[in-house]
C-alpha cells in the first residue's frame, strides 16, 4: 500500500487538477469493465454462476473474491479471470497506446489501473503513470465493490429469468 501511496502523494497536485475527469472516468470505466464481461458471457450462453464470476475481473483478486460471493459465482473462476485480465492488460497495453497514439502518462496509467490493474506495467512508463494506475485500481475496486453487489440482484433476474 505504501508503495502505491508514495508515488500518488508525489503526483497529488496533478491528481487535484483533474479530479472531475478521474471520477467520471472511474464510474464509466468500472461500469463498462463489468458490463462488457457480463454481456459477452451471457451472449455466449454462460450460466449465471459463470457470468457472476467474470463480472469483477477488472479489480484486484481480494476484492473480486468478496464481490463474487454476492453474485453467486465461483471464487476460483473469478481469481483466474482477474489474473488473466492483468496479464493481458500488461501485455497489450503498450501496443494499444502506440496504435492509438496515447502519450500522456496520466491516461496510460489510469487506463491500465482501471481496466487491468496493471500497475507494474504502468510504472514502466513513468512514476506518474504508476501513480495514476494505483489511483485507478483503488477507485475502480471501491466502485465495483459497492455497486456490483447492489446491482447484481437487479441485473441477474433480467438476464436469467425463471
Where are these regions (language model features)?
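Hydrophobic transmembrane alpha-helices of secondary-active transporters
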Residues: 1-15, 62
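Alpha-helical membrane segments and immediately flanking helix-loop junctions
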Residues: 50-77, 84, 103-139
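Discrete transmembrane alpha-helix packing/kink hotspots characteristic
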Residues: 89-92, 144-148
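Juxtamembrane boundary at the C-terminal end of a transmembrane helix
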Residues: 147-162
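Short juxtamembrane and helix-loop transition motifs at transmembrane-helix boundaries
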Residues: 9-20, 41-47, 68-74, 96-102
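Hydrophobic alpha-helical transmembrane segments of integral membrane proteins
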Residues: 3-4, 109, 145-146
Amino acid at each position: 500500500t505504501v508503495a502505491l501511496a508514495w508515488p500518488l502523494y508525489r503526483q497529488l497536485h496533478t491528481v487535484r487538477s483533474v479530479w472531475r475527469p478521474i471520477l467520471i472516468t472511474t464510474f464509466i470505466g468500472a461500469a463498462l469493465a463489468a458490463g462488457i464481461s457480463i454481456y459477452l458471457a451471457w451472449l455466449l450462453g454462460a450460466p449465471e454462476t459463470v457470468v457472476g464470476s467474470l463480472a469483477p475481473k477488472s479489480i484486484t483478486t481480494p476484492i473480486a473474491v468478496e464481490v463474487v460471493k454476492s453474485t453467486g459465482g465461483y471464487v476460483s473462476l473469478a481469481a483466474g479471470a482477474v489474473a488473466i485480465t492483468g496479464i493481458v492488460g500488461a501485455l497489450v497495453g503498450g501496443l494499444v497506446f502506440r496504435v492509438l497514439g496515447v502519450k500522456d502518462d496520466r491516461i496510460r496509467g489510469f487506463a491500465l489501473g482501471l481496466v487491468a490493474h496493471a500497475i507494474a506495467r504502468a510504472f514502466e512508463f513513468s512514476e506518474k503513470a504508476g501513480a495514476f494506475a494505483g489511483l485507478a485500481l483503488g477507485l475502480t475496486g471501491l466502485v465495483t465493490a459497492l455497486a456490483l453487489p447492489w446491482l447484481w440482484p437487479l441485473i441477474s433476474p433480467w438476464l436469467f429469468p425463471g
